[in-house]
Amino acid sequence: MMKRIFWHIFFLTIFLTILYLPVINRIKAVPPGKTYTKVHRIFEDYYYYLSVIRQGRGNWAEVDQYTTEKTNPSRVHLFYLFLGKIARITGISDSDAYYGAITVSLIIFYFYTCRLIRLLLPEKWMIPTLLIIYLAAPLPDFTFYLFDKKITTTYGWWTNTDIYHRLSLIPHHFFTGALLIGTVFYFILYLRQKKIKPAIICGLITGTANLFFAVPGFIFLVSVIAACIIFPAIIYLSAIKPLKKNKIQVFFNRQILTGLIIILALSVLTQAFVYLQLKLLGHPWSDNLIWEYNTYHAERFPYQFFIFLSSYGILPYLMIILFVNTILKPTFEKIFLLLIGMMPTILYLLSAGGILTINKIRFVYGAPYVFGGIAAIMAIRLIIGKFHNKLIPALFLFLLFLPNTFISLKNYRERDVKITNYNNNEFIPTIYFEAADFLNGNTEEFSNVLIPFNIGTLLPAYTHNKVYIGHEVSTADFWGKYALSNRFFYEKDMNRDEVQKILGNNRIEYVFWDSGPLPEIYSEFMAPVFRKEHIVIYKTKI
């Protein structure tokens, strides 16, 4: 027992260190006159989620603060509204609630990973499996040509499979990924016990996950349906004729079918609820799925499938061994495990091919290293079983994983731990927060502010105002507005009619100016109400 506790503490300490070391390093190095906002991953998304947490302190619905258009309040980001309630009750800051959610998700992720390993593998394989799941890494960067096409394998900003990003996913992605592992655990437990209780728990967990982020639940749902089709097909094609019908009937008995109906019903209903939420809430949510799909479709991001595949490192190649074994000795468990490990890749290809209108890069969220790592260990056990000397293949496979782990940790140090730029969206001049305090104390809630894009991403996280532009997904005609914003603030070439139009059509009440001298034409439409160094906030006269 003490040995097991030691290893759990050991692993969690390593994981939490990897998660928080970049943050601690930056807290210690904040330049004078600047504030470190603890930006996590993509700064636009981070500030957006902070704005929802901020609203969640007092509301059960969010107003889109990243557009000046009229939008319906929504509960699309229900996870962050919950975090807002927790932050209000506990008295912690929005960013602390955000990082607290990552920490809790990491612990749940680890807990269900251990339970799933213990369910599927002998106890002695626990530590090797954890090492592969958490320390294996994507393939290193390299480029080659295939039929005159340049193919690059590297970890992309969207794959999330390098060591650091695997342990610090965006909170709702991480939390639902952790619940996905719990869902798989109870699903396999149900298959073994043939009792309804694990099936109900499985359905409730996947249903809960769907309400927060539907992609992991969708991967699970499709994997279960595919396994229910593929398993009897393999049995029918491979079994001795008198046993075919009997073997299929024994597995799909009344108890199994009842549990499957419960699991699938809860999963489908919650998936449908989330989809209807997006469709019924109006802009921008009703167009979100199509916008994402069109933006990240294959023509705009060609050949990324190779990056997606290489992001799994050597795991897919070990899974091939288990795949062959499963064809020869099929069981529903092995088929399902292979499917849920491979399903993100299959769905990615369906999306890239135009068959499935869901953003293809969404399918990185499915805990692939957990299922792939367990499948890899199963394959390794098969390999080792063929040798009289067990040490040689074990050592070979260990050395196979080691270089990638070393490269990934080196990349983590260079890309994430080291500070390479102090003039970015992490270290914000403190005067911008003084301007935010002014807006909070002197403007009406959800009043519209015209602001440059780079500051528009930040402001809603710290004020109650709506901004003209700040996030690609949250406003109509983003690129058109982006061009107009650049003309207004940086090119400063708008005539009187254009200034009146951008202020009037968007019901702009305040202008946040940090772009040097104000053009004379602009001054006809606004008057200063706040001034601090190079920042001026104007009240419009429209």
Regions found by a protein language model. Name each.
Residues 1-30, 124-130, 255-262, 394-397:
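Start-transfer (signal-anchor) and selected internal transmembrane alpha helices
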Residues 17-181, 208, 212-218, 424-426, ...:
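Active-site lumenal/periplasmic loops and adjacent helix-entry segments of GT-C-fold
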Residues 46-47, 331, 403-542:
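Extracytoplasmic
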Residues 175-198, 235-238:
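Membrane-interface transmembrane helices that cradle and orient dolichyl/undecaprenyl
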Residues 185-186, 198-216:
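Membrane-interface alpha helices of multi-pass inner-membrane proteins
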Residues 211-338, 345, 355-358:
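Transmembrane catalytic cores of multi-pass membrane glycosyltransferases
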Residues 218-223, 357-385, 396:
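Hydrophobic/aromatic-rich transmembrane helices and adjacent perimembrane loops
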Residues 254-268, 381-413:
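Signature aromatic-anchored transmembrane alpha helix within multi-pass, membrane-resident enzymes
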